[in-house]
Amino acid sequence: MVSLIDQNQLDSFIEKNPSWIIDNKTIKKEFKFDNFIDAFGFMSKVALLSEKMDHHPDWQNTYNKVTIELTTHDMGGITTNDIKLAESIDQLINT
């Protein structure tokens, strides 16, 4: 079951993943790549992952940069699904 995370859980996530920032009721991260093709390839991987998890990011792409914001709109904030997706996205980068 999806639930909003509390401040302690959010602080713990940010401590372990300092490249993600809290922005209002979202967690946000900017990814930089060598070029547009690499950025778009990353977005394709995230799209497949998101579809599999049935949880989708808000994102923006400008040339070699991809900004991802995660929140659960119908819950009104950051949930366990957002944390799981953020961790899974980071694993894509680290593999």
Task: Show which residues each predicted segment covers.
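N-terminal first-folded block
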Residues: 1-34
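Short arginine-rich
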Residues: 22, 47-57, 94-95
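Alpha-helical scaffold segments that form or flank carboxylate-/histidine-based iron centers
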Residues: 29-35, 68-73
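Short amphipathic alpha-helices within nucleic acid-binding modules
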Residues: 37-43
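Solvent-exposed alpha-helix faces
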Residues: 44-47, 87
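Mid-chain, well-packed structural core segment of small domains
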Residues: 52-61, 67-72
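C-terminal structural segments of small proteins and small subunits
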Residues: 68-92
